[in-house]
Amino acid sequence: MLRIIMIPLLILLLFLLFKSCIQKKNQYADVDATQPEMDVQLLDVNPYSRPGTTIDHVNGIVVHYTANPGSTAQDNRDYFNGLKDSHETSASSNFVIGLEGEIIQCIPTWEMAYASNDRNADTISIECCHPDENGKFTDATYRSLVQLTAWLCAKYDLTADQV
């Protein structure tokens, strides 16, 4: 009698586990994780914005908004590159996303950027432009951020918890 009850329960348990695995796999199915279009404008190697230090293993993605509202992705990229001459600080990002959703890659993903202090050595950084002081992204910036982040997560086998 116990065997008759256990077999259907085992089948039900296996079905529920299978269903859970399928749902988890499809959790991000509606997100475009293809490589987004980007303009690669690598910074010159220098001690202030692109040290040329290789990242051993990417353990996460850090997202910031820029410190200068209303600026463009190109403005921010050029500022980072200009630090080699001004020496005013150490700052950079692997990617900058502009107000229109344009993406500029400033540093290769296998190299360290100066974006997040303690996590520079094991993360990829993304700076997002925003139009005003409230820091809210434009829809175009947000869409590009989602696609870029999804692509990087797929490329480096990262989870949402690592963003």
Show which residues each predicted segment covers:
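N-terminal catalytic cores of peptidoglycan-degrading enzymes
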Residues: 2-117
